[in-house]
A protein has these predicted regions:
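Conserved active-site segments centered on acidic
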Residues: 1-72
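Short, functional N-terminal and low-complexity linear motifs
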Residues: 19-25, 86-93
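Alpha-helix C-terminal capping/helix-to-coil transition sites in glycosyltransferase folds
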Residues: 76-78
Length: 137
């Protein structure tokens, strides 16, 4: 089966979309699913914020060297599904591409643990839904 791609996009590509993509990829590998995720943002930070690095580290994941990337039209065109956090990535860069908006996600800067719980809970449901159909929209 062809590997299918989910593009997670948040404004800075360094917190919400990073949590989502890391979680999504971990679950997909654990369950041997043909899905992979990317992370990016239209205004990428130069580096991952300290509270995000610390939050990941507390969960045994090292993102200290991760460099946020600029969202690109070809990256989104290659995705089977776009999941955006409070930015119009799909509409701006890949009109007509299936997109889910998770705009109500709590700010990672306010409380990493609350945002982590929200995002990973949504990712679990997304993976379960995709696994049930074995394809993306």
């Amino acid at each position: 089966m062809k590997q299918q791609k989910v593009a997670f996009v948040c404004l800075h590509g360094s917190a919400k979309s990073l949590i989502a993509a890391q979680s999504f990829n971990r679950i997909a590998v654990q369950r041997n699913l043909p899905f992979r995720a990317t992370t990016s943002g239209p205004e990428p930070d130069a580096q991952v914020a300290g509270n995000v690095v610390a939050g990941f580290k507390g969960r045994g994941i090292d993102v200290a060297q991760y460099k946020p990337t600029l969202v690109a039209a070809d990256q989104l065109a290659d995705a089977d599904l776009i999941v955006s956090f409070a930015c119009d990535a799909g509409r701006r860069f890949a009109p007509g591409k299936p997109e889910e908006r998770w705009d109500e996600c709590p700010a990672v800067s306010d409380d990493f643990d609350v945002a982590w719980g929200f995002i990973t809970g949504r990712v679990e449901k997304l993976v379960a839904r995709l696994a049930a159909t074995r394809s993306l929209p």
